[in-house]
Amino acid sequence: MTRLRQDSGGQGATNGGNGNGGKGSSPAIKLEGVSKAFNDKKVLDDITLEVAEGTGFCLLGRSGTGKSVTLKHIMGLLRPDSGKVFVHGKDVTALSGLELAEVRRSMGFLFQNSALFDSISVGENVAFPMRRHTDWPDAKIREAAKGKLAEVGLDKDYDKMPGDLSGGMRKRAGLARAMALDPDILLVDEPSAGLDPITSDEIDQLLVDLKKKGTTIVAVTHNIPSARHIGDQLAMLHEGHLIAQGTAEEFDKSDDELVRAFMRSESSG
């Protein structure tokens, strides 16, 4: 298994069967020695990892171990106390506001609660990023939004309100909105949260399908079956430290009892 400070995110190209991991000469995402503290409590302690382009990367760990904080650093919502964060080779910790906005346009975000606007239709939720970031005419935006909804099986739900959707349908709609601008990277926070096992599997498969098309997926999850399904590489955080990184098979065979115990659990939240 790959251990702390041994960068091997690119190994994901040899695992998971999608064959996309080697298409880029540099990693899609790279963290170098990232540390972060809140009120003198260190949440991330010298985190170094890489995510190969076109692969699935799952961050594992119990609640409060720094997984979502790591995701926020990649998004540029937080700046590390020390260390650097690179997205497509650009150090997001050193970018201006305009430069960071440009990098963010290459990323999509699927939040745990789907984060849909309840006051507008499902279709207009998906269309929102297009209206904000393109100069497309209304007809093209509507057509594109319908296409994104069709990709997640919601082609008949454009005019429905978010409150009319089930939890799984809301998650699908959130995914359609996250992919509205065809981002290279998709960041996902707890894709299985609040979903039954069948719906969770369906969401996982949608993420795998996106990965097969070349999208880099970074998912924070407690759900071990989801991590096995999505992740070419897994990384486990514990008390702010990166204690393991490797494939699911390597995690299963780890000599670290904490890692093996986590992998044996169906859900560790």
State where each predicted segment sits:
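Helix-to-loop junction immediately C-terminal to a conserved catalytic motif
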Residues: 75
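Helix N-cap at the start of a conserved alpha-helix in ABC-type nucleotide-binding domains
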Residues: 197-199
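Catalytic Walker B motif of ABC-type/P-loop ATPase nucleotide-binding domains
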Residues: 186-189
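Conserved ABC ATPase "signature" region
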Residues: 90-91, 138-157
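A short, proline-enriched helix->beta-strand linker immediately N-terminal to the Walker B motif
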Residues: 180-184
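Conserved ABC ATPase signature
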Residues: 161-165, 169
